[in-house]
Amino acid sequence: MSDSPGTPNGKDTIRNYEFTPIGYVKERETSVPAVANSDSRKRSSPYRSPAADDDGPPQKAFRADDTLNSTRIFNDSSFDDTLPSQSVMNSVRINGVSDLHDNGIEEENGGASNPLKEQQETLYKLNVENYNLRVKCNSLLKFLNNVTDEGELRKNLAVIDELQEWKGKYQELKKAYRSLQLKFDQSEHKDQADLEQDARSNEKEMRSLQKKLQEYQEQVTQSKKLVESLENKLGNSASGSKEIKEQFEHKSSLLQERIDKLESELAAKDKELEINRNEIKNLQNDLQKANHDSSSLADQKLQTRSKEIENLNNRLKSAVREREAAEHLLKESQNALRSLRAELSTLRQESDRKLDDLSVAKEKSERVLKERLEERTSQSERLQQRANSLEQNAAELSSRLQLRDQRIKALEDEARELQKMNQRIQDLNDGKDSEKLQAQNQKLDGLRSEIERIKNEKEELERDNDKLKKRIVAQATKSPALKANSRKSLEKDAEAEKLRSRVRELEQELRVSKDALNKLRHNYRRDTDELKLQLEGAETDQVSAKRSLEKEIDRLKFEIDSLRESRKDEIAIMENRFNLLRRENEQLSGQGGSQLASLQKSLTEKQKEINELVQRCSDNTMDRLKLNRELAKAQEAESEGKREASKLSARLEFITKEFVKYKEAKTQGGEAGADRLNEKWSEKYQHMKQRLLNELKVLQEENLELERATLERKGSAGSGTYNVGMSSLQDQLDYYRLKYHREVAHTNDLNVMNDYLNRVLRASAQHVRLDILKLENEAPPDAFPEFTYRGRLRFKTVALFVLAAVRVQRVSLKLRWDSQRLNYLQKKIALEQDKITW
């Protein structure tokens, strides 16, 4: 028999406690103390009470309570819906029951007295009481350590008493729970075979379902292949849209005629049905009359009426067959309409593709025209700039020519003066200073040669100017064609550079001539001073000198006037050419505007054609919708007619069966029984007749309402305008699909939350059980050493927290996008429904 547990503060008795300290690892014992009761077994359950073992309080190796850092509940793996195996649960409960039996709790009403057993029980009770007293002492010590000197000791003692009372109640409840657990384990032994059978049947069902899934997957793949082949066929049959459209119109007209014929036939059949119903009513009336006549006459009439009923049944069967034929025709028409719808969809796709091609071609043509206009405007601007630059160059050249003319005139005046002076010197000196005169004559010849050279350069510049003007005119005439503009611009730039270099050379030559003139002036002044000294006394021949000088002046004036007139003509020619260039530029801009106008007209025409095509497409869709509605209504009418015919045939068969039964009963029974049966069947017949009449009235009223509705529909078919498009249907489909996916996701989230809360509740219940066991077998707080790793965050917790934050952010973004999409689709559908004019 085991010793009683020692004091709670003893470090050497920790191994006898139920719970090991947190973080404390038990050392393996080499020798186990002898146990008095060798037959008793230890419980396999982790939750053991003091009454479970004879070795003292039960023991349990417990892990460190890391509830703060533990993320086992929040892992994805914890959301596993699999239940624990039944064998484990049964083993736990069975062991519990066997332990209860071994411990002797259920053996109160045993057989003969056993002194050893009684001693064991008394010792066990004493151990339990001792343990409870120690727990109380420990709890009292805790409370006393925590109590202040403010008079709270009595309150704490009262709380301790209440705790003890509740512990006693808990022990009683625990005993009741154990008894119930025993009963439950006994009942579960019986149910285990049933559970195994259920598991086998479930496995069989799973296998069959997997086979069905494989079959469905194969069917899906086959259907996908069929869809792909059909799509390929549809893509191949896209050619010949106009012929298909004409065929569709022809087929639709034929189908409309066939539908009209079927409606007329249905109306005729309805009339025949009404006639048959009237005949049935008449027959029923005759049957009522025949009931009052003699039995023989009734039999004969019944036979005749039964034959008539059979004839009517045959007629009804023929009518049903005709209905079936009409339904077959309707199905064929529906199939034809479906094929026509497919052709319409292909036509619509082709029209959309053509519209896209037209829009692309229109955009390309607009881009090309814009680029051409921009090129022409840029070329006209360049030509204008070049014309302006050429005008400036011409003005500069004219100003330079005027300056040169003035210089030439001055040089000519100086030459005349020198000639006069030479003549005077010749007259006065007659041979004096011949060397000086020769030098002056040489200088005069040099000046004349320079003047001639300058005149030649002027003529060359004028020729270059004329050439430039001709080139400008040629370029202006060739500008509409826009040929080799870059090359001509380069040539013009090169020519302009040549002209500039030529102007620079002329300016340099002018500078040289200016220097020479300055030198000549200096020499002239020096010579004039010398000549003045020589001509102080020479005053003869002044009249002749004056005349010669006047002649020279008149000649020079004439030359100057001729030069001015020639320049005026050149300026007028330049102005005319400039005006011509301006007019040609205006003509080019006008041609560009006319081309733009023509392009805009062509664009408007194409836009009209596109609008017409769109209108045709919308009309085709409207016709298709009308045909669909009419077909649906015709199908509904056909189905209603079928139902009515089936009901009537069933009722007629029932009536014939009743008549047959009536005949048999009449032949078998006597007259009294026959009278009773006649009364019974007459009442039944009247009741059925009334029901049939009521139903016939209801059906007639429904037929009249349907006919009125069809007539109103036919009358209002031409007046109504529908602007329903496939886009609204697509938007509605997208809206409801998105809403459905959102609801499915919401339900999945709710299921996950529910599972999570269930698992949290289970875990919390498990923690509560563990806390209760701790309170029952309370250990001192000083028995557990302090561990440094307690309360420390782990990398796994931080990583899971970050992952959860990322998932929450993604889900919130997706929800926001879905809500925005739903709002947009809802507004769009509302706007499109507002646009519909019924």
From Swiss-Prot:
This protein's record includes keyword Nucleotidyltransferase: no
Transmembrane portions of the chain: none
Biased composition (Polar residues): 287-303
GO cellular component: cytoplasm; nucleus; spindle pole body
Predominant place of localization: nucleus
Cellular localisation: Nucleus; Cytoplasm, Cytoskeleton, Microtubule organizing center, Spindle pole body
Keyword Nuclease: no
Disordered: annotated segments: 1-67, 187-209, 287-310
Keywords carried by this UniProt record: Coiled coil, Cytoplasm, Cytoskeleton, Nucleus
InterPro entries: Spc110_C (IPR040593)
UniProt-listed Gene3D superfamilies: 6.10.310.10
Coiled-coil segments on the chain, per record: 163-644, 682-709
Free-text function comment from the UniProt entry: Component of the spindle pole body (SPB) required for the proper execution of spindle pole body (SPB) duplication. Potential role in cross-linking filaments or anchoring other molecules. It is essential for growth.
Subunit and interaction comment: Homodimer.
Family per similarity comment: Belongs to the SPC110 family.
Name listed for the protein in its UniProt record: Spindle pole body component 110
Organism: Lachancea thermotolerans (strain ATCC 56472 / CBS 6340 / NRRL Y-8284)
